């Protein structure tokens, strides 16, 4: 069984553990006696995978940090006077100090190996769509929206091109938005005045794909759009008539095949 470890060797299902210690047992509603909070927080900072790892073991009292262990320092240090006795005591205990120093490997690198396959190595390809924010005639100010959604990890590069040339002015981005399901989304907008015949391209680079994703938006005049819609409508109408004709033909054929010559015994 593979499990996440806490400093000290015990297996847990969380990387960060919060321990709350109250001054008395849970009180009934209406009890106004003071409460006191003691909270340890353990952090692993990874640089270039596990090439360099920094471990922090931090302790808070009433939301104020009092003492910490930093693997880059190698011992406990008091952050406030309240934490000085703890720092001095833990540094005097050889087993506690050795355990904290070893946590870079026994805690951080161990847990990195457990979760790496579904966190660091996880890849989800983005979905890209392009559309104008407003429906209006050409040669009017508009905002072209490149919607990039459902991707992981969050490192992504979105660029706009006009007729093959990169556009850097007039770009507005929402930044990364977390979807709450381990995926991200972002909107990158381009302020422009579209003219007939222009081709706008949104290009997306992401670790989940080997080559950039591109989606085009072509500026068309109202007459060109109406011609295109008429063509599509005529094509769909033709398919409907073709389907109806084939249906009638095969139905008639089936009816004729069921007739038998007079006097024929089967």
UniProtKB/Swiss-Prot annotation:
Q: What is the effect of changing residue 42 to G?
A: In allele DRB1*08:01, allele DRB1*08:02, allele DRB1*08:03, allele DRB1*08:04, allele DRB1*12:01 and allele DRB1*12:02
Q: What's the reported outcome of changing residue 177 to R?
A: Decreases the interaction with CD4
Q: Which pairs of Cys residues are joined through disulfide bonds in the record?
A: 44-108, 146-202
Q: Does Repeat show up as a keyword for this record?
A: no
For this entry, list what GO says about its biological process. antigen processing and presentation of endogenous peptide antigen via MHC class II; antigen processing and presentation of exogenous peptide antigen via MHC class II; detection of bacterium; epidermis development; humoral immune response; immune response; inflammatory response to antigenic stimulus; macrophage differentiation
Q: Known consequence of changing residue 39 to Y?
A: In allele DRB1*03:01, allele DRB1*03:02, allele DRB1*08:01, allele DRB1*08:02, allele DRB1*08:03, allele DRB1*08:04, allele DRB1*11:01, allele DRB1*11:04, allele DRB1*11:06, allele DRB1*11:11, allele DRB1*11:19, allele DRB1*12:01, allele DRB1*12:02, allele DRB1*13:01, allele DRB1*13:02, allele DRB1*13:03, allele DRB1*13:05, allele DRB1*13:07, allele DRB1*13:12, allele DRB1*14:01, allele DRB1*14:03, allele DRB1*14:05, allele DRB1*14:06 and allele DRB1*14:07; requires 2 nucleotide substitutions
Q: How the protein is affected by changing residue 38 to E? A: In allele DRB1*03:01, allele DRB1*03:02, allele DRB1*04:01, allele DRB1*04:02, allele DRB1*04:04, allele DRB1*04:05, allele DRB1*04:06, allele DRB1*04:07, allele DRB1*04:08, allele DRB1*04:10, allele DRB1*04:11, allele DRB1*08:01, allele DRB1*08:02, allele DRB1*08:03, allele DRB1*08:04, allele DRB1*10:01, allele DRB1*11:01, allele DRB1*11:04, allele DRB1*11:06, allele DRB1*11:11, allele DRB1*11:19, allele DRB1*12:01, allele DRB1*12:02, allele DRB1*13:01, allele DRB1*13:02, allele DRB1*13:03, allele DRB1*13:05, allele DRB1*13:07, allele DRB1*13:12, allele DRB1*14:01, allele DRB1*14:03, allele DRB1*14:05, allele DRB1*14:06 and allele DRB1*14:07; requires 2 nucleotide substitutions
Impact when changing residue 59 to R: In allele DRB1*10:01; requires 2 nucleotide substitutions
Q: What is the effect of changing residue 57 to E?
A: In allele DRB1*01:01, allele DRB1*01:02, allele DRB1*03:02, allele DRB1*07:01, allele DRB1*10:01, allele DRB1*12:01, allele DRB1*12:02, allele DRB1*14:03 and allele DRB1*14:06
Q: Per UniProt, what does mutating residue 43 to K do?
A: In allele DRB1*07:01
Q: What is the effect of changing residue 216 to K?
A: Reduces the interaction with HLA-DM complex that results in impaired dissociation of CLIP from MHCII
- Residue ranges for the region (Beta-2) are 125-227
General function of this protein: A beta chain of antigen-presenting major histocompatibility complex class II (MHCII) molecule. In complex with the alpha chain HLA-DRA, displays antigenic peptides on professional antigen presenting cells (APCs) for recognition by alpha-beta T cell receptor (TCR) on HLA-DRB1-restricted CD4-positive T cells. This guides antigen-specific T-helper effector functions, both antibody-mediated immune response and macrophage activation, to ultimately eliminate the infectious agents and transformed cells.
Q: What is this protein called?
A: HLA class II histocompatibility antigen, DRB1 beta chain
Q: Which species does the entry assign this protein to?
A: Homo sapiens (Human)
